[in-house]
């Protein structure tokens, strides 16, 4: 099968680098999508479920563990010349950890804002919202930051297996209504469960469409 026809989520992904500051960013090339969310929103678990690899993104019970931009790409590309992966997933540091020192929070904010504002290959940020708690104040702050940076973002509800199934459509509608007037928000809200696998194909398809890849299965 030609490289361009490889299914996006049908073969292994690998971690390629952690980025503690902008000087460590890989050269701009393939399209990128980033995942953002509060500490312990289930970000690493969702990325692992998305690509079907339990140990790809590190999961931790310690909030605020991820302090770098972590890059993941489909395996099988050398990265040399034109042999580049079709896209990259960027796992952003979790925010909103109450015990994080102010210096750490300030560093996170600067790294993230500089990345968001200056990365031409970034096509969309998926902002994860815990379905049990809804949009919190620190989520609102991040959405405002994304609006100011003029970066397209889409909200994704996580852990929907933790709430009653009939409540999910109502929560989706309420969440969509809350972001309706935000200039950079994509209007459709997605719902997922890493535990049960619910909504993962919808998210895979959304990512593939965002980066312009037809063959994602």
Swiss-Prot record:
Signal sequence extent: none
Q: Which PROSITE patterns does the record associate with it?
A: G_ENGB
- Asked if the record carries the keyword Acetylation, the reply is no
Can you cite an annotated GO cellular component? cytosol
Domain of life of the organism in this record? Bacteria
Q: Which cofactor does it need?
A: Mg(2+)
Task: Give start and end of each EngB-type G domain.
Answer: 29-213
Task: List GO BP terms, alphabetically.
Answer: division septum assembly
PANTHER family for the chain: ENGB-TYPE G DOMAIN-CONTAINING PROTEIN, MSS1/TRME-RELATED GTP-BINDING PROTEIN
What protein name applies here? Probable GTP-binding protein EngB
Q: Which organism is it from?
A: Rhizobium etli (strain CIAT 652)
